[in-house]
From Swiss-Prot:
Keyword terms, alphabetized: Calcium, Cell membrane, Ion channel, Ion transport, Membrane, Metal-binding, Potassium, Potassium transport, Transmembrane, Transmembrane helix, Transport
Domain comment as written in the entry: The channel is composed of 4 repeated units, each containing a transmembrane pore part and a gating ring part. The gating ring is composed of eight identical RCK (Regulators of K conductance) domains, in an alternating arrangement of one domain from each of the four subunits and four from the intracellular solution. Two protein interfaces between dimers of RCK domains from the pore-forming subunit and from the intracellular solution hold the ring together. One is called the fixed interface and the other the flexible interface. The flexible interface forms a cleft where calcium binds.
GO biological process per UniProt: potassium ion transport
Intramembrane residue segments, as ranges: 49-58, 59-64
Span(s) of short sequence motif Selectivity filter: 59-64
Domain of life: Archaea
RCK N-terminal domain span: 115-230
Extracellular side: 42-48, 65-69
Protein name: Calcium-gated potassium channel MthK
SUPFAM superfamilies, alphabetized: NAD(P)-binding Rossmann-fold domains, TrkA C-terminal domain-like, Voltage-gated potassium channels
Length: 336
């Protein structure tokens, strides 16, 4: 008993600070007031008194009860006033809570409770392209800048206010429950700090990082990034290879373009697939589905243009190019 009293004494002040708790206690007090009043003034049972209290507070007025004493009439009037007043206060507080919560969400001040979402740490023009590609997915951008917040909300994504290099803010974005984390910060040193913070929280979440300088790619990998992309290296090489004809750059841009009729796609081979143990030649994927096979990923290895005698295994990732309907046929063909 002493332990229970001590627990109540310790936690009660904190619980009472919650607006919802105070409203609940106010409603409960009115119900107790009405039930006790009808019981002692009108002489009704506790069950009937509780029922009359709810009917009176709700102003339903079924017509199955009216006070039989003058004191009961006065009491009913006070209960109606208290009931309507309490209901009005409860609705006002509820609306205030919902509005404040929505405002806090827009400001990025609410912790992310989602799972299997994508977290983007930082902001750049690359981020904007990411958001276009991830349209329809649950995406949260973690950044501090007010201008970034406006851009994120305009793009239809969610904003989380915080410093991507701070572990507490990474936890706020719930990187532990994320499907993947994209790190797109201004400098490689910030990117490394961010990756280390993410790995401190979750050792298995997939991290894709952007490298500002080519010589830092290996350091980002050592910090814990699963995939490191250097847009400057890619664009530089494509520009240099476009000097003579430019078809290589044209191919990459067309395949990756948002409005392209053909898309590059990764399709995993599941357990029990009809392609398990089947060679590239016998699978005849292009003739069956229309998808052009560029390569096959197995573990950390990417086999570009796999030989005809290459046998597929469960867990292999087929990298191909095709139209949306061809890609759908490939998925159905693999899972059949």
């Amino acid at each position: 008993m002493v332990l229970v009293i001590e627990i109540i004494r310790k936690h009660l002040p904190r619980v009472l600070k919650v607006p919802a708790t105070r409203i609940l206690l106010l409603v409960l007090a009115v119900i107790i007031y009405g039930t006790a009043g009808f019981h002692f003034i009108e002489g009704e049972s506790w069950t009937v008194s509780l029922y009359w209290t709810f009917v009176t507070i709700a102003t339903v007025g079924y017509g199955d009860y009216s006070p039989s004493t003058p004191l009961g009439m006065y009491f009913t009037v006070t209960l109606i006033v208290l009931g309507i007043g309490t209901f009005a206060v409860a609705v006002e507080r509820l609306l205030e809570f919902l509005i404040n919560r929505e405002q806090m969400k827009l400001m990025g001040l609410i912790d992310v409770a989602k799972s299997r979402h994508v977290v983007i740490c930082g902001w750049s023009e690359s981020t904007l392209e990411c958001l276009r590609e991830l349209r329809g997915s649950e995406v949260f951008v973690l950044a501090e800048d007010e201008n970034v917040r406006k851009k994120v909300l305009r793009s239809g994504a969610n904003f989380v206010h915080g410093d991507p290099t701070r572990v507490s803010d990474l936890e706020k974005a719930n990187v532990r429950g994320a499907r993947a984390v994209i790190v797109d910060l201004e400098s490689d040193s910030e990117t490394i700090h961010c990756i280390l913070g993410i790995r401190k929280i979750d050792e298995s979440v997939r991290i894709i990082a952007e490298a500002e300088r080519y010589e830092n790619i290996e350091q980002l990998r050592m910090a814990g990034a699963d995939q490191v992309i250097s847009p400057f290296v890619i664009s530089g090489r494509l520009m240099s290879r476009s000097i003579d004809d430019g078809y290589e750059a044209m191919f990459v841009q067309d395949v990756l373009a948002e409005e392209s009729t053909r898309r590059m796609v990764e399709v995993p081979i599941p357990e029990g697939s009809k392609l398990e143990g089947v060679s590239v030649l016998d699978a005849d994927i292009h003739d069956v589905t229309g998808v052009i096979i560029i390569g096959v990923g197995r573990g950390d290895e990417l086999i570009i243009d796999p030989p005809r005698d290459y046998s597929f295994r469960a867990g292999d990732i087929i990298l191909g190019i095709g139209k949306p309907e061809e890609i759908e046929r490939l998925k159905n063909y693999i899972s059949a």
